[in-house]
Amino acid sequence: CVVGKKGFGFFPDKNSNFRYPQIGVVIINDNTEIGCGSTIDRGSLSNTIIGKNTYLDNQIHIAHNVKIGENCIIAGQVGFAGSSTLGDNVMIGGQAGVSGHLKIGNNVQIGGGSGVIKNIPDNCRVMGYPAQNIKNFLRENK
C-alpha cells in the first residue's frame, strides 16, 4: 500500500495546471489493517484520519482530508473522494464509491457497487446508484 502521497488537487492556471499544496498528514489509529494495493493520500490543509479498529480490504483509495471513524469495515475496490467523513461502525461493500465533501453517519451500511452522491444520516442501509434506502432499492429492482 501507499500511505501519505500527495493528494490529487489541481486548479487551472493560464498556461497549465497548478498543484494545490498538500501539507497535511495521514493519521492511522490503533488496531487498523490496510490491505494490499491501497492508497491513502495525505491531507491538503487538514489531515487524513483512519479511526481505530478499522479494517480496509485490498485496492481501496482514500483521498486527501478523508476522515474514517472507528470500527469500520470497508471491502475491496472502494473509493473515497476528498474531504468525505465517515462516522463510526460503517460497513461498505466492494466497489462502492463515495463522492467528495460528503458526511456518512454512524452505523451506516452501504451495499457493494453503490454510488454515494449525497450525505447519509445515522443508522441507514443504502445501495444502488444513486445510493438510496435499501428497502426502496429492493422494491424498485425486483
Regions found by a protein language model. Name each.
Residues 138-142:
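Long, leucine- and charge-enriched amphipathic alpha-helices
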Residues 1-133:
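Structural signal for interior beta-strand "rungs" in well-ordered beta-sheet cores
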